[in-house]
């Protein structure tokens, strides 16, 4: 596959492309590779949002299908109609807490759904099938030592490490990985597998720890922490995993696994403290700005100093609520990602920059996930018994003008300034529920 952007001409199917990672990736590919066609398949479950796809819904090289990967007839229709070259398989249930309560659904969606997709793919001449797995398939990054003190030692997992999943979610992803590998061996399907650290950023559904903490604080509620909060995770900002997929699309070798990781590691408790700090700092800045506008005298400087001193000795306990731990909670996920780095990838967004951008996005978009009725939206067209958004031959000039007018102001694209105020994004309007 040629590295030059203008020669990158492919038809790329992204399953789960209206979700968090998938939507950022779909927007990036649609805008960067104008000669390619980006097709998104998503059933618009609770953690997906058609608005995530923002300004690309009417791009000439984009199309959206609403449907389930468990629907083999739908998959066959899409592959036959679109002549898919590359599949990036992101569709999955991913929330660990839910997997303890609804494990059968995770098996059905993550394993059986992947199997249906593989069965369809084997009948077509794909160039790449990228299965998006998780670092959690490795299990906890601690192994027990055999000395008399029962010490544990840290272990970094590379792509050849044994899979040792410890919860129903990670087990379902590991099981699907084995299916993917079997289709590579048995049917020569050109597969690549990725395993990434935790991803965060704008548009993530607020069941995950970072948006959950942010939204709780924005609503004057406490951060809820499992157990002691000493479990650690490694965090990558969304733009960095998108750039990793760009590299893997162009340079990844068939039959290989690539870890996508970062050396930045932080405990759940310290994540909460960091977000609390940002929240208080932003509030203090707003208050100080108001004070300066109302009273321009030397006392304001003293007040500012007092606020900072109070902040430094702040008691975090009033912002945190400790709850029962998960049935099993991996201590850490430390992965070696040198293999991907050797292809030329490196992260570009620091934790400090990424977490501030993320907080500001949620602060400016507090109602983004509220009152979403995924079954009642406008401008859906029927074609061969399945539904899709995207550019149609009958799009009128007014729609194109609307798209051009709003395209530059889309608040859900990851590559724009996040300090955009309260402007509404361009999207196909959702009908409000009665």
From Swiss-Prot:
Keyword Lyase on entry: yes
Residues the entry annotates as binding substrate: 134
GO biological processes: nucleotide-sugar metabolic process
Region (Disordered): 286-310
Active-site residues per Swiss-Prot or TrEMBL entry: 135-136, 169
Cofactor needs: NAD(+)
Record field: compositional bias (Low complexity): 286-309
The family this protein is said to belong to: Belongs to the NAD(P)-dependent epimerase/dehydratase family. dTDP-glucose dehydratase subfamily.
Name assigned to this protein: dTDP-D-glucose 4,6-dehydratase
